[in-house]
Amino acid sequence: MPNQEKMEKAIYQFLEALGENPDREGLKDTPKRVAKMYIEMFSGLNQDPKEQFTAVFSENHEEVVIVKDIPFYSMCEHHLVPFYGKAHIAYLPNDGRVTGLSKLARAFEVASKRPQLQERLTAQVAQALEDALAPKGIFVMIEAEHMCMTMRGIKKPGSKTITTVARGLYKDDRYERQEILSLIQKG
């Protein structure tokens, strides 16, 4: 579990190291506010995304299931600044095994609430879905803007990073993969 007191002390010292006075009016409560914010932002650290798939049903459904345009934010583990965007999750049920639609978004939320890399986030969500449902195919796509590319370094606001993970049928069958991409890209 996060140690809020230790975080507050570290943030206080960080402000001092910047040459700021952490005791001045505008900064006096900043260590506490920042620590609380990071505890919230990293709330997925002690959770497993696959544990979000608590509702699994046997339905007579053998066609693709897609939840798209899931808004999210996460924190780049290299710079501890946000990246944000939208995720698309698709799977092809195996033997009619489906999950509640909200469970896909919940699993994604848990995986995103930790210091993260977009590539790893994409793979973790795909793995959680594979572990929970063993579907015939999985396709996860994330489109995100990274503040580490917008605010510092190269300074290219508006640039997007797209990552994908395809498993099973969507990895092996080019036609099936193209169909998923087409469905995701439809307005």
Curated annotation (Swiss-Prot):
InterPro entries: GTP-CH-I_C/QueF, GTP-CH-I_N, GTP_CycHdrlase_I, GTP_CycHdrlase_I_CS, GTP_CycHdrlase_I_dom. GO terms for biological process: one-carbon metabolic process; tetrahydrobiopterin biosynthetic process; tetrahydrofolate biosynthetic process. One of its GO terms (molecular function) is GTP binding. The keyword Hydrolase applies. The keyword NAD does not apply. Pathway: Cofactor biosynthesis; 7,8-dihydroneopterin triphosphate biosynthesis; 7,8-dihydroneopterin triphosphate from GTP: step 1/1. CDD domains: GTP_cyclohydro1. Zn(2+) binds at C76, H79, C148. It comes from the Bacteria. Keywords: GTP-binding, Hydrolase, Metal-binding, Nucleotide-binding, One-carbon metabolism, Zinc. Transmembrane segments: none annotated. Pfam families: GTP_cyclohydroI. Gene3D superfamilies: 1.10.286.10, 3.30.1130.10. Toroid-shaped homodecamer, composed of two pentamers of five dimers. HAMAP family: FolE. This is GTP cyclohydrolase 1. It comes from Streptococcus agalactiae serotype III (strain NEM316).
